[in-house]
């Protein structure tokens, strides 16, 4: 089946990313609903709204960390399915809420589900992708996040045309997510498991069968055999390293470095400020004098711009220009846009100067464009690529949970308060971080992983599987069977407990 099957598989798995985008974006329009604000006796800039969004991010942090355990023990497929089932329960609770507690519990469950899927979907995609197209395949995750934002915005926009006396304004958008959640939960039963996970569990014949299904084009049998040999030898070498629990990720120098890269790329993504805009852009537009249905209409257009840009980037550019250059470009460009946004806002505090308001909307839009040309797809691709197989589940869980969702929880809680209290000065926090911390870190320390197999990336960080594998590992042909010993593949067995850290 080859490339078309791989793309279809990755796109369907990215339904989990769609739910990530939908659940992240749905509250943008829900908090515009007068019926919702009246029903829960709150305002847009209250701590209650911050709590609704921060409980979602907090749940996602927990889900991401838990996902590391389920991915390693039960597989990539199971983790995605678990997230989909939990999302379904969260959708039911939110849409049927009779009080604030039900909304908060529903948001925690939705966040938990999104946390599971946000770290498992990119890993699953990276492990089924061909090295030449991995950027595009994993980039589909960010594409579906964007589509989720689009759908949530237009579903919300349409629902807000219901009378202010109707709870349909907010119950229907919260219920809609149950449809893709159910589709994903059932559909993943028919999808194959990651071949790398199958090799790790000793299911060698099944792993080879799936590799052929994913990549065979009628002429590349030798390449598939070489890829299989490399995957198998690498995983056997890494299994020779005693790696129980989570602490080992911090004790082995190479793994610690690679984990840090994964965490930092997620932190830097959050510090662009784009998710703050995603959650609270309607508040920002209100400050610019754009109110009523015009407000949600502008938000809907905003949420279309990013995914369109992202699609163009992942199809035509990502696997050509690499990872580092787009992220450095995005850091500089987003910072300039944030500074310009703050400057215009500072001269239009009452939102009555139309020209300044238009300029403010323009720079908010440019932020999502620059983000979609850089951190949007690159952060997920880079995180999935830099993790070694032996800690890939736990490593991606930790990077997503701490780097992405813990930071998101903080900004979700404080942003509505900050936008009300310090207004335009809030944007300078993100610009300063980007220019003073993100840019030099990427320039001096991040590696270029483009066009390399997941096993070849080991060499960028000091050697294959902690330097235990020979350079010609791809040409070796380990014997089949679970009874193999490490020394039969030419691998030196090392116990981490006796290594100098």
Where in the sequence are the language-model features?
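Alpha-helical transmembrane bundle of multi-pass membrane proteins
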Residues: 1-216, 223, 229, 233-501
């Amino acid at each position: 089946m080859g490339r078309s099957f791989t793309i279809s598989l990755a796109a369907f798995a990215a339904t989990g990313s769609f739910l990530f985008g939908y659940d992240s974006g749905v509250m943008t329009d829900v908090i515009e609903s007068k019926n919702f604000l009246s029903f829960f006796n709150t305002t847009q800039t209250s701590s209650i709204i911050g709590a609704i969004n921060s409980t979602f991010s907090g749940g996602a942090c927990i889900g991401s960390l838990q996902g590391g355990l389920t991915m390693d023990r039960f597989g990539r497929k199971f983790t995605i399915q678990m997230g989909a089932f939990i999302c379904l329960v969260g959708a039911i609770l939110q849409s049927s809420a009779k009080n604030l507690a039900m909304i908060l519990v529903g948001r925690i469950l939705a966040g938990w589900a999104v946390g599971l899927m946000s770290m498992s979907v990119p890993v699953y995609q990276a492990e089924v992708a061909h090295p030449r197209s991995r950027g595009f395949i994993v980039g589909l995750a960010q594409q579906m996040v964007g589509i989720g934002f689009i759908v949530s915005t237009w579903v919300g926009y349409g629902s807000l045309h219901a009378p202010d006396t109707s709870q349909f304004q907010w119950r229907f958008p919260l219920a809609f997510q149950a449809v893709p959640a159910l589709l994903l939960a059932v559909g993943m039963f028919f999808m194959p498991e990651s071949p790398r996970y199958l090799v790790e569990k000793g299911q060698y014949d099944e792993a080879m069968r799936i590799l052929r299904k994913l990549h065979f084009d009628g002429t590349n049998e030798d390449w598939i055999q070489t890829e299989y040999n490399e995957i198998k030898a690498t995983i056997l070498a890494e299994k020779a390293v005693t790696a129980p629990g989570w602490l080992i990720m911090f004790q082995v120098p190479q793994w610690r470095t690679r984990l840090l890269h994964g965490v930092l790329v997620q932190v830097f993504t959050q510090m662009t400020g784009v998710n703050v805009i995603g959650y609270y852009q309607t508040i920002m537009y209100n400050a610019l004098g754009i109110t009523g249905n015009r407000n949600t209409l502008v938000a809907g257009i905003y949420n279309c711009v990013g995914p369109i840009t992202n699609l163009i980037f992942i199809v035509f550019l990502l696997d050509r220009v690499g990872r580092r250059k787009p992220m450095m470009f995005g850091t500089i460009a987003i910072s300039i846009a944030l500074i310009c946004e703050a400057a215009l806002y500072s001269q239009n505090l009452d939102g009555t100067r139309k020209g300044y308001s238009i300029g403010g909307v323009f720079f908010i839009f440019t932020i999502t464009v620059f983000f979609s040309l850089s951190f949007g797809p690159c952060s997920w691709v880079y995180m999935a690529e830099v993790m070694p197989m032996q800690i890939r589940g736990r490593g991606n869980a930790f990077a997503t949970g701490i780097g992405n969702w813990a930071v998101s929880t903080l900004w979700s809680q404080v942003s509505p308060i900050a936008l009300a209290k310090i207004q335009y000065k809030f944007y300078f926090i993100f610009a300063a971080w980007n220019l003073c911390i993100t840019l030099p870190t990427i320039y001096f320390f991040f590696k270029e992983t483009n066009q390399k197999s997941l096993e070849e990336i080991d060499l960028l960080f000091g050697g294959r599987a902690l330097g235990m594998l020979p350079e010609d590992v791809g040409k070796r042909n380990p014997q089949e069977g679970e009874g193999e010993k490490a020394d039969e593949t030419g691998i030196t067995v090392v116990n981490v407990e006796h290594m100098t850290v």
